[in-house]
């Protein structure tokens, strides 16, 4: 529960009433509040309040407000393992990942000729990422932590993160892997109290060595990674049958995200600089460079390249662009 405000506030109160037989744990972070628990009409009433609140001061490029401003976290779930087991059971009972003949045919086609587990995982992750379009369509009451089934996702070919992740889990299972959905909070940390503080759904797959590898097909389009390294050290909770504690995504070393620029320039007698740049990148650096092209229409590519040059010099002129048939064949001529 966010306990910050964008306006001066005299008093903010949050009250929750639960059955007597229920237990609830809570903690207030990054500030102080008054709290109480009273018995009212045969129920437990928890009240939390702050007074004389001023707008929380923001800073440029600051962390998410959930990581800096006052907030209340509470849960009736004892431990993260309990929530992990529940998340697993609710989807297994519903049959979210039941195999589908036409989807099985596609899986067999994709993994044909792939020899290693990582080759199979990669081709399935990228196909799901590129072919299940992200589209948030309201379906009314009932939307929540239960993932839509394979038939719906494969037929519609669209959905939000849980539909994309659910499709990948289904594909991985049809390829013989042990895979499950996982919950995460993109943009801020998840505290130790097992509260419902998630905004994103991903997947995990068990590797041959017995470890689970996180996969995020929602962020994979136009990205060479299987998990966005822009989300390093991010908390996530897998819905696995043995139950899991809160996990943390691994750190990716800087050398996995290099940028190498080779410049071949010549200064003419009249002071004009002519030449070419060759840029090589990997990981998130590669994704950032690709985003110059992937975040707009192809008809805007030339204007986009011109903006890149004008950022170097307002007198720069784009002479020519040869995008080639493949990304590695794209060449740009420039003049400064």
Describe the role of every protein-language-model region.
Residues 9, 41, 102, 196-200, ...:
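Short, solvent-exposed loop/turn segments at the edges of secondary structure
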Residues 329-336:
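Conserved small/polar residues in nucleotide/adenosyl-binding loops
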Residues 121-123, 129, 141, 148-159, ...:
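Active-site-proximal cofactor/substrate-binding loop regions of enzyme domains
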Residues 26-46, 182-185, 251, 291-324:
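Solvent-exposed beta-strand/loop surfaces of large extracellular or lumenal domains
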Residues 1-142, 268-271, 276-293:
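Secretory-pathway-linked proteins and extracytosolic
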Residues 104-105, 140-149, 185-187:
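Short, conserved phosphate-binding/catalytic loop or strand-edge motifs used
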Residues 162-252:
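Hydrophobic/aromatic-rich core segments of domains that either
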Residues 246-249, 259-264:
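Long, His/Glu/Asp-enriched segments that create or flank divalent metal/ion-associated functional microenvironments
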